[in-house]
Amino acid sequence: MKIRIDIPHHPYDIQIEKGCMAQAGQWLRELWQPQKVVIVTDNHVASLYAEKVKLSLEDAGFQVAVFDFLEGEERKNLTTVQKVYEFLVKQGLTRSDGIVALGGGVVGDLAGFVASTYMRGIHFVQIPTSLTAQVDSSIGGKTGVNTPFAKNMVGTFAQPDGVLIDPLVLETLGKRELIEGMGEVIKYGLIEDPELWALLTGLNGSVESILEHAETLIEHSCQVKRKMVVEDELDNGIRLYLNFGHTIGHAIEATAGYGKVMHGEAVAMGMVQISKVAEEKGLMPAGITQSITEMCQKFGLPVDYENWKVDKLYQALTHDKKARGNTLKLVLVPELGSATIHPVSLEEMKDYLVK
């Protein structure tokens, strides 16, 4: 299946197909002329797929080198970026060459940032290997790295030339790594896609059920992401809906220490906490918090952060990228399948941190 991201200045396709990673070279040859390519990946993904993708690209006529770094959210920083820059220079990459981001969200965000800044921008593509990356972070052009202050605080908007999604690679994920991706999938059902929510309701929450329906879950999620990105590429309007649960979720990730709480886990906890307070304030319908909580728990996602410290979470919120002055754009769900922006002051956000 192909999903077109029809952005006027940089349209591209998401290709979703079981087993398609084996044809990565043929796919890339349709996008780029043979040239130098650097695969950016982490050490874990490299051990599984780097050689397979490298050989496929070489068979298609590309000159290929591989750069891998230690896996983990804590490596998504400017220190790693500098190391990639140095590798690209040693390989002699020019503006006519490109980067293949092969990995999960950390790899995709970092490699995209490198591509968008090296020599003021070179071409790149995404081959996401985690569920979170396949349904969310590989699509839409947000790149970035973390700082000690906030997640993705340094970044760019830079669209890839294509996204290649192979649902079969999810079978090599650990249980926790697969389940955390369901945080984003559940979010899509809540903010835009009642049909997806109904599908999730019908699943029993097991790893087997996720893998069996992975292609459908990915397609639904990508369609929602496509709509938001095409209408609002630079995150000034409808695309903000994608941040449901992320305001508190990012604060949890930052205060826990990057890599301690996985992104989808933090999003799940953020959705539940925001919904609980918003429901109490009459801003979200009665019973929706229970529905979200039960859905997250069914798939094994955490719904409560055990190291909850209001002062530290609040400090992290002050660095939120969606803040405008002293106002945050909080995303709420007034009814299943729709979202809205509710501006709140930083002071009022303290209410949303009360357990």
UniProtKB/Swiss-Prot annotation:
It comes from the Bacteria. The lineage of its organism: Bacteria, Bacillati, Bacillota, Bacilli, Lactobacillales. Its EC number is 4.2.3.4. GO terms for biological process: amino acid biosynthetic process; aromatic amino acid family biosynthetic process; chorismate biosynthetic process. Keywords: Amino-acid biosynthesis, Aromatic amino acid biosynthesis, Cobalt, Cytoplasm, Lyase, Metal-binding, NAD, Nucleotide-binding, Zinc. Belongs to the sugar phosphate cyclases superfamily. Dehydroquinate synthase family. GO terms for cellular component: cytoplasm. The keyword Amino-acid biosynthesis applies. One of its GO terms (molecular function) is 3-dehydroquinate synthase activity. Gene3D superfamilies: 3.40.50.1970, Dehydroquinate synthase-like - alpha domain. Its main location: cytoplasm. NAD(+) binds at residues 71-76, 105-109, 129-130, 142, 151. It is an enzyme of class 4 (lyase). This is 3-dehydroquinate synthase. Binds 1 divalent metal cation per subunit. Can use either Co(2+) or Zn(2+). Zn(2+) binds at residues 184, 246, 263. Its cofactor is Co(2+); Zn(2+); NAD(+). Catalyzes the conversion of 3-deoxy-D-arabino-heptulosonate 7-phosphate (DAHP) to dehydroquinate (DHQ). Pfam families: DHQ_synthase, DHQS_C. Coiled coil: none annotated. Pathway: Metabolic intermediate biosynthesis; chorismate biosynthesis; chorismate from D-erythrose 4-phosphate and phosphoenolpyruvate: step 2/7. It is found in: Cytoplasm. The keyword Zinc applies. The gene is aroB. It catalyses: 7-phospho-2-dehydro-3-deoxy-D-arabino-heptonate = 3-dehydroquinate + phosphate.
